């Protein structure tokens, strides 16, 4: 039983690292696009859509992080 718990814990830790990386990636990309848009003199719809997309992805991955942390706490 302990063997399986250790495997599950390692898997969850690996997934948490992946989630945190994805959150960081989408946050930094969104920030770069926002800065680029602020420097532009005209409105770019594609850029606005990309910013919106990365904002939604940050929300989704933050929710996934919360769920995974809850599961990790329940398994301890």
Feature annotation, model-predicted:
Residues 31-74:
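Short, charge-rich amphipathic interface segments used for partner binding and complex assembly
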């Amino acid at each position: 039983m302990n063997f399986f718990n250790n495997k599950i814990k390692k898997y969850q830790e690996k997934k948490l690292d992946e989630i945190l990386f994805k959150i960081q990636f989408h946050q930094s990309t969104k920030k770069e696009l926002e800065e680029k848009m602020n420097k532009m003199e005209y409105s770019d719809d594609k850029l606005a859509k990309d910013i919106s997309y990365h904002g939604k992805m940050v929300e989704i991955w933050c929710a996934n992080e919360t769920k995974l942390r809850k599961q990790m706490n329940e398994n301890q």
